[in-house]
């Protein structure tokens, strides 16, 4: 059975589950349609809110951010989870207390101002539009890779799916569908991570595997990762951030932004009591933490596996030939999310930190072709080459390398991780279903916000 067929089966079964739940939990009253009757249990609502929050950004991009940024990227974990502490303490109970269906209704009633309510509508539309673009883009990326369709086609399929179960079931249907999506995305995220953790460290718990020894090297896996990335000219994975104040302020910004996300806030209208709103925030944090506990391990191990793929004999030896690249790399090249440019025409894939040399070389080529400022582009190339030589004692230049030749979009690392690690085809199909569940769950929440805006206005 082909990988495409397996992907279709997993995605098709997950969609059938969502449609079935939407039909089973369809709204019977206006209250059920808009706020699920106001009777959703905090645990159920916490799971639905977690799915609503763990969008394509968390499922698809989070581990990629950690893989690229290392310790410095942990601000995203702290900020996004810390936002729920603010939400539980300062917002959630009061939203439920006023008993309004929408955030602008709450703002207008709380401040006795229609102007304030209108400003809230405008802010909500701006935030929602920006956020939903990312979710639908994530769905398009997942569809284009796993179902082998164009990005635009993937976006349209996602929109139809969301429209169907949102309109049919209302907020009640969305709530229970998002519970199912949470289960799907957590299974899809965790199972590949368990396989990879076992393969690299022998520990079945990815979060603990991150602090275990590498099976082959016999040293802690983070030590192994630090060694290979620094040998390639990158900053050590566990390197401290140079400016702690920036890190703190960035974390606070993420916390405040998380607490104010409109598609998350609206979920606190669906519980029976004010106390349940606070409990919902607590349970949401628990369910989100289950994924975020695994994300650092997924990111670190994905980066190590990617480097091992390019340098199978170790980073001190020659990289693989482009013609011998694995099938998963060929597939992702078709999506445009992996790009290769043979700068020195040796047929091999040089992936390293070239201090911007590769980008400067491309800019010089473009300037020569388009009649641009060739002198400035040439100077930029020389500056980058000097910086590279100073940093790495000219090792790469001496080897004949002329710049980094492989550009890997960090957003693909979670989706490509099972393929990079040579996991079974059914695991790849499972993560396809999980990636789509993550993108669709948040898209449904934002569709509902737009629908409420149209009803309100």
Describe the residue ranges of each PLM region.
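Loop-to-helix junctions at membrane interfaces in multi-pass transport proteins
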Residues: 2, 38-40, 44, 61-75, ...
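Membrane-helix boundary/coupling elements in multi-pass transport proteins
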Residues: 123-141, 335, 339-344, 352-360, ...
């Amino acid at each position: 059975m082909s990988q495409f067929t397996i992907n279709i089966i997993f995605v098709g079964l997950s969609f059938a589950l969502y449609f079935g739940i939407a039909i089973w939990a369809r709204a019977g009253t206006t209250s059920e349609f808009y706020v699920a009757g106001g009777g959703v249990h905090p645990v159920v609502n916490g799971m639905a809110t977690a799915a609503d929050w763990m969008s394509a950004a968390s499922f698809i991009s989070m581990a990629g951010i950690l893989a690229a940024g290392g310790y410095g990227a942990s601000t995203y974990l702290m900020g996004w989870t810390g936002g729920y502490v603010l939400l539980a303490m300062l917002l959630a109970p009061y939203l439920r207390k006023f008993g309004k269906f929408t955030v602008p209704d709450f703002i207008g009633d709380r401040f006795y101002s229609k102007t304030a309510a209108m400003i809230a509508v405008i802010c909500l539309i701006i935030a929602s539009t920006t956020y939903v673009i990312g979710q639908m883009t994530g769905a398009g990326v997942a569809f284009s890779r796993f179902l082998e369709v164009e990005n635009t086609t993937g976006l349209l399929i996602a929109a139809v799916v969301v429209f169907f179960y949102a309109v049919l079931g209302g907020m009640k249907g969305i709530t229970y569908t998002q519970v199912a999506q949470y289960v799907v995305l957590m299974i899809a995220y965790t199972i590949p991570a368990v396989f990879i953790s076992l393969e690299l460290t022998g520990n079945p718990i990815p979060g603990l595997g991150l602090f275990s020894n590498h099976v082959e090297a016999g040293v802690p896996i983070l030590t192994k990762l630090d060694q290979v990335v620094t040998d390639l000219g990158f900053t050590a994975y566990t390197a401290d951030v140079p400016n702690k104040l920036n890190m703190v302020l960035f974390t606070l910004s993420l916390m405040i932004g998380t607490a104010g996300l409109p598609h998350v806030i609206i979920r606190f209208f669906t519980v029976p009591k004010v106390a349940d709103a606070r409990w919902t925030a607590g349970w949401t944090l628990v369910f989100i933490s289950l994924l975020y506990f695994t994300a650092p391990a997924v990111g670190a191990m994905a980066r190590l596996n990617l480097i091992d793929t390019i340098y199978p004999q170790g980073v001190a030896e020659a990289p693989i030939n482009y013609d011998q690249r694995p099938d998963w790399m060929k597939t992702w090249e078709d999506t445009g999310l992996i790009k290769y440019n043979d700068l020195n025409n040796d047929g091999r894939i040089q992936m390293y930190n070239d201090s911007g040399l590769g980008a400067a070389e491309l800019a010089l080529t473009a300037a020569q072709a388009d009649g641009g400022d060739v002198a400035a582009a040439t100077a930029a190339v020389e500056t980058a080459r000097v910086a590279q030589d100073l940093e790495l004692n000219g090792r790469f230049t001496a080897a004949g390398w002329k710049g980094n030749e492989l550009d890997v979009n960090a957003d693909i690392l979670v989706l490509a991780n099972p393929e990079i690690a040579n996991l079974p085809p059914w695991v790849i199909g499972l993560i396809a279903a999980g990636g789509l569940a993550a993108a669709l769950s948040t898209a449904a929440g934002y569709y509902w916000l737009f629908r409420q805006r149209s009803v309100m206005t």
